[in-house]
Amino acid sequence: MVKISEIARTSTFAWSSKNLPLLAAGTVAGAVDINFSSSATLELWDIFSPTNKTEPIFSATVDNRFYALAWSKPFEGRPQGLLAGAFENGTVEFWDADVLIKTKDLAKASVHKSNKHTGAVKSLQFNPIQNHVLVTGGSNGQIFIWDTKTFSEPFAPGQAMTPMDEITSVSWNNSVSHILASTGNGGYTSIWDLKTKREVLHLSYTGAGGRANFSYVSWHPSQSTKLITASDNDSCPLILTWDLRNSNAPEKILEGHKKGVLSLDWCKQDPTLLLSSGKDNSTFLWNPIEGIKLGEYPTTANWAFETKFAPAAPDIFATASFDGKVVVQTIQDTSPSVSTKVASTDDNEFWSELSTTETQQPVFEVKQAPNWLKNPSNVSFGFGSKLVIINTDSSGKSTVKVDKFVAKGQEKTEKLFKDLKNDNYSSLIQDKLEGETVNENNKSDWEVLKRLSETGKESLFEDANNDEKEATSPETKKENGEDDFFEHLGNGETAKKEEVFVPEGNFKIFTNNENEDSKKLINLILRNKTEEAVSSCLEQKKLVEALVLALDGSDDVKQQVKNAYFKKNKENNLSRVIYNASTKNVTDLVAHANVENWKEVAVGISSFTTDSSEYNSKMSELGDRILKAKDGKRNDAVVCYLAGGALDKISNLWLQELPDYESELLSLKSEEITSPSDARLQALTNFVEKVATYRYITKSTGEFSGPMVEPLAKAILEFVNLVAGSGDFDLANKFLQLLPSEFSGTEKERILKATSKAVEPASAVKSSANAKIAKPASSSGQTRASINAVPAPAYAPPVQAPPVQAPQPPLVQQQQQQQQQQQPNRYGYAQPTYAGAAPKTNPYARTNPYAPSNNIYKPASPVATPSSLSGTTSGVPPPPPKASYKHETEGWNDLPDTFKAKTAAPRRAAAAATPPVSTPTPVSAPAFGSPGQPPSAPSQPGSVGSVSSAGYPKKTFSATNVLPPPPKSISRSTSRTTVPTSSTVPASPKPTPVSNKYAPAVTSDASQPPSSGFASPTLNSSPRLAKNPYAPSVTEQLPPKISYATPPAHHLANNGPSTPSYAPPKNPYAVPPSTSVSHAGIAPPPPAPKLGSAAPPPPQPFGSSMSMPVQPAFNGVPPPPPPVGRAVSTPAAAKIEQPPAREPELPVQSKHPKGDRTHIPENSLPIYNSLTNVLEAIKPNIPEKYAKHGTDMEQRLNILFDHLNNEEISNGVIELLLKVATSLESKDFANATAVNLQIATEHSDEIGNWHTGLKRLITMAEAMY
């Protein structure tokens, strides 16, 4: 039960027949009001209103109180039916419900009023078949039939066999319109036939508790011969079901009420549901067909005198009681238990919550689903356009038939598949242009695709050269019919030569009026000092002379003159064009040229770009500029995108236009398009056809790719779902091959199963992909399975055998699993670790929205490299990771995409305040029998002991574990969210060694670690790393700070059941492993598997190579060091002593209390005022589903205001915040976003929890301000 509403009235009520019904309530007669008031009211309640369910939508005072109310179904002239009231003074009044609701005037709504009854009217009901016919019953045994269309004189149904003093209930038969029943205080129930106008049957019952005094009667919802009665005798509180074909005795007797039953209601939609209420203050739900009680609803404080289902919403019912309440609730109980509602641990709070919490809950003895929740049909649609039909013959045998269902539009998808299969795209394009293209944009797209398919990219910009006139060549002359060149071979010049300058006559070096600068210039020229001469020309602003001199000069001189020319003519459009041509770089042309001349810019891109990738990039950039221009033409941008191969961008543009395309399809009123789903399928088909045609024209192969591929992939996946649902599996599968595996895996598996083809589980596909990526690394999972399941053969090459480990507590196991993740292969290709290197990630893996995003502004963390154990290793750097298709760099609680602007600039996460930490990488044993592994070399000093040829381990183990010196404390400014840590590191005790009865016998001569907690590394402990000038020195790093962020998804491993879902933070008090020769350098062995089973593989990041050191799960925190001094000995439980907890440091006290705004400086006050105004403007518009986001945003903004009030924000940030506030008030959201990003990048040490709130305010304001 879920309580929907509670009306504080002592009223009788009636439901309207709407799906979301109204409730009419009238003050009930015979009850004393809590205020001892004698007034009476008639009210209408909209209990399903989302805004106002606590107040009536209509209320009016009436002269007398009601015994009953009835609300008819709509009929002729009454669009919302009639509301009838039975008054205690014998009056029956009728109101037009439609007029009453619209005018809120009781007098205007009244259509008839009658005093035909001589006493109180106790009951009335409208006929369920003839909605305008009403029956009323009351004192003196009077029963009248009313015709509410004409309001003619009401008539009695006939003469009663045994007259009764009072009629308490009347009820119409639900199947036969002229049959009704009445009951009263005479102890019997009468059945009346209006055709014969007489009482035809007489029902009574006497049981062990005495004679039943019938108080209520109700007919079966669908069977005309069955009805039910209730007795209000406290000694005989029974509910009796009757079949009139045997009226001598009741069919079922329902016992459960402890006192008399006052009301019944038989559900019209489900005959197996019956409500009852009575003098014992209870309301029961029954199955009257089986005669069993289903459940009991919370009791009231006084008699529950009326209960009724809502006619059109039977899962809702109302109960009225004399304790002054009408409770509306659901028949199903979905409310939480009382223990979850009252969960306070404080005694005072517990009693306070208990007193205000609804503690009563329904109790159901039998669980039964109502009919409206059951499947009403024996026909069902199946995946792949299948129709399953179940038929039952006369003998009761069922047959199942599976047919093919041909949906609308399936012919088009079949034709599309044929065209794709036969590469018949020219026919597809022609059909699109000849058919109905719906709108001009779609037609233009197909025309461009046609030109592109026929003449290539060059034809798209041919109009840019229409004004050029080519010079007439000799070949042209010959074609035009002029004389041949050879006819005049000996008669004259074969071609016109250019005139060459030949100096003539005498001249003076210096004229009479020559100035000194000119003389100096001439002297420099005569001395062949070209560079100085050019500089002198430029000083004298003789640019032409400088250009001529530079022709014979060096490249530097030419560049000098060019720069002078371009600076002098920087405002000249020809100069800008010459600059782009001179530099052979069209970046300036693409970025700043007016987009009105986009075709000329495109020609320039074609002329000066050197490779296809640069050409595509510039064309795509030009398309972006055209699309963003105020008067930008969409079709011009489409041409640039198509020419530049920007399928992801052009597809996004097409996807944005899909809703309009669907609306236009629906407006055509075609026979093929009759519903929005038909329009959606055709729009998606048209989109897919354009994508497929473009890929064919440009000879694109492989999967979809690009930075904006996600919307394209989702649209293709939607199309695949639709056509696969129609049974076009081949077409769906063809497009699934083009999708990245991140999108197509599950759907591909589903289609392959539907077509009964062999299917490889998605998990196996991913695992094989990971195996390819991590090929050089050892598979510790295989190692463990091999060593534990099969003994090593005698002729096998010597390999290292890790000791088998006894079961460990969950925390220890997890620490060991983390270390095993980071163990490189001794004999594989060692990959060098660089400062700031990050683990490889799978580009298709789902991003964890709760993990902190990688920050490109964070200083790179230098990573310590372990010392070489034995032999020589060659370093092969890992390939660069492929860019992920999903750039999910938002915070965990950012707004959904609904509030995000479509053209918002990409945002980067702020730099983290935690300093990088140098992390030693542990060493692992090679995989047993791993392919591609060379045989192990003989054991050398400082290496892990190897297994002999007989397969038994040697007795000695040694390793060198080298750690960098301890970090020194340095002074560094931290963010306000930084957690202070102590630099004290107490010693950690050595854990007790454990053994495993399944491990081979091993003895150990392990030396004890030295007393010193730290040791200097050897000079040759690691290869020399390239120094990063921006990374902090290894010797100047703070102790690691514990960050309690959830680990990223690509670091989460497939842990066993006992492994927590997060990695434990490093113990800041633990002593690093010793550098002496001991067992400390040996990587912890895997947990021992159960007998007879192979050990599970170690957890590893999805899509990352095992030879790469895995970053710790916590941001900036290295994994815990391996256990010190582990050895194999007699069985013992592993004990881990916890270091003493240090006292937490007291937080820094703020200058002013939280919430104080009186100390905000003048220069910061506009920030507070503007942001507050915007916040208050959008708060009322925030949808209810995003209310938590709005509350969180306001709390974070208050943190910013507190910082402003305490003057804790630098002037640089304040200036940028002023720009954000100004941009928000002027609704320049793009600029506000850009400035907010600038704050994150330039002042990362100052942004704290408030920055996310500011970002959300900008996003919400863009949607609602």
UniProtKB/Swiss-Prot annotation:
Residues 457-480 have a biased composition (Basic and acidic residues). Residues 457-485, 765-784, 793-1163 are annotated as: Disordered. It is found in: Cytoplasmic vesicle, COPII-coated vesicle membrane; Endoplasmic reticulum membrane. It comes from the Eukaryota. Keywords: Cytoplasmic vesicle, Endoplasmic reticulum, ER-Golgi transport, Membrane, Protein transport, Repeat, Transport, WD repeat. InterPro entries: SEC31-like, SRA1/Sec31, Vinculin_CS, WD40/YVTN_repeat-like_dom_sf, WD40_repeat_CS, WD40_repeat_dom_sf, WD40_rpt. Residues 794-810, 1062-1071, 1083-1101 have a biased composition (Pro residues). Gene3D superfamilies: 1.25.40.1030, Functional domain of the splicing factor Prp18, YVTN repeat-like/Quinoprotein amine dehydrogenase. SUPFAM superfamilies: WD40 repeat-like. One of its GO terms (biological process) is positive regulation of ER to Golgi vesicle-mediated transport. WD repeats lie at residues 6-46, 61-105, 116-156, 162-202, 209-252, 256-296, 299-339, 380-403. Coiled coil: none annotated. One of its GO terms (molecular function) is structural molecule activity. Residues 1004-1023 have a biased composition (Polar residues). It is a peripheral membrane protein. One of its GO terms (cellular component) is actin cytoskeleton. Residues 811-824, 865-875, 901-931, 939-951, 969-987 have a biased composition (Low complexity). The COPII coat is composed of at least 5 proteins: the SEC23/24 complex, the SEC13/31 complex, and the protein SAR1. SEC13 and SEC31 make a 2:2 tetramer that forms the edge element of the COPII outer coat. The tetramer self-assembles in multiple copies to form the complete polyhedral cage. Interacts (via WD 8) with SEC13. Component of the coat protein complex II (COPII) which promotes the formation of transport vesicles from the endoplasmic reticulum (ER). The coat has two main functions, the physical deformation of the endoplasmic reticulum membrane into vesicles and the selection of cargo molecules. PANTHER family: SEC31-RELATED PROTEIN (PTHR13923), SECRETORY 31, ISOFORM D (PTHR13923:SF11). Belongs to the WD repeat SEC31 family. This is Protein transport protein SEC31. It comes from Candida albicans (strain SC5314 / ATCC MYA-2876). The gene is PGA63.
